[in-house]
Amino acid sequence: MTTASPSQVRQNYHQDSEAAINRQINLELYASYVYLSMSCYFDRDDVALKNFAKYFLHQSHEEREHAEKLMKLQNQRGGRIFLQDIKKPDRDDWESGLNAMRCALHLEKSVNQSLLELHKLATDKNDPHLCDFIETHYLNEQVKSIKELGDHVTNLRKMGAPESGMAEYLFDKHTLGHGDES
């Protein structure tokens, strides 16, 4: 492994922050990978919930964009990107829409906790640029995602999922599909 050359643009950017950004990049890519797995599961012919598939594919793209935004920040601040292996999702069979939404909720809470820890590190290292970046691009979006997923879990449960297959079909069609006829 070659050592990265020192940056001429680096200023007030602590090595701990740089390392934490690299870990966050990996976590965002892992989240993207999990959502991609969920999307493919719901797109299977024996599951056939196309709006669950679309929803999770959209989430996958969002998480990848989060990782790319962090990579751009790393380069702007004079840090160096060191990519790690992306962990395989814990499962391939997501069982039901309700289970996938519960797993997604847990995942988003984990990502949010990691971002909060990154923000605390930036505060401790007196890095207002990093604090502002996290606040502007991530924290509010995470709270909205967690609320949306929590609502989806509640609504699926109220409709009788996972015992009622009709509940997931109707949720797929009318909530995730926004009532579309396609």
From Swiss-Prot:
PROSITE patterns xrefs: FERRITIN_1 (PS00540), FERRITIN_2 (PS00204), FERRITIN_LIKE (PS50905)
Keyword terms, alphabetized: Acetylation, Cytoplasm, Cytoplasmic vesicle, Iron, Iron storage, Lysosome, Metal-binding, Oxidoreductase
Catalysed reactions, as listed in the record: 4 Fe(2+) + O2 + 4 H(+) = 4 Fe(3+) + 2 H2O
Positions that bind Fe cation 2: E63, E108, Q142
EC class of the enzyme, as a word: oxidoreductase
CDD domains linked: Euk_Ferritin
Single GO BP term: negative regulation of fibroblast proliferation
Entry GO terms, CC: autolysosome; autophagosome; cytoplasm; cytoplasmic vesicle; cytosol; membrane
GO molecular function, one term: ferroxidase activity
Record flagged with keyword Ribonucleoprotein: no
Subcellular location: Cytoplasm; Lysosome; Cytoplasmic vesicle, Autophagosome
EC number: 1.16.3.1
InterPro entries tied to this protein: Ferritin, Ferritin-like, Ferritin-like_diiron, Ferritin-like_SF, Ferritin_CS, Ferritin_DPS_dom
Binding site for Fe cation 1: E28, E63, H66
N-acetylmethionine, modified sites: M1
Residues modified to N-acetylthreonine: T2
Record-stated family: Belongs to the ferritin family.
Its job: Stores iron in a soluble, non-toxic, readily available form. Important for iron homeostasis. Has ferroxidase activity. Iron is taken up in the ferrous form and deposited as ferric hydroxides after oxidation. Also plays a role in delivery of iron to cells. Mediates iron uptake in capsule cells of the developing kidney. Delivery to lysosomes is mediated by the cargo receptor NCOA4 for autophagic degradation and release of iron.
Quaternary structure note: Oligomer of 24 subunits. There are two types of subunits: L (light) chain and H (heavy) chain. The major chain can be light or heavy, depending on the species and tissue type. The functional molecule forms a roughly spherical shell with a diameter of 12 nm and contains a central cavity into which the insoluble mineral iron core is deposited. Interacts with NCOA4; NCOA4 promotes targeting of the iron-binding ferritin complex to autolysosomes following starvation or iron depletion.
Protein's recorded name: Ferritin heavy chain
Native organism: Rattus norvegicus
The encoding gene: Fth1
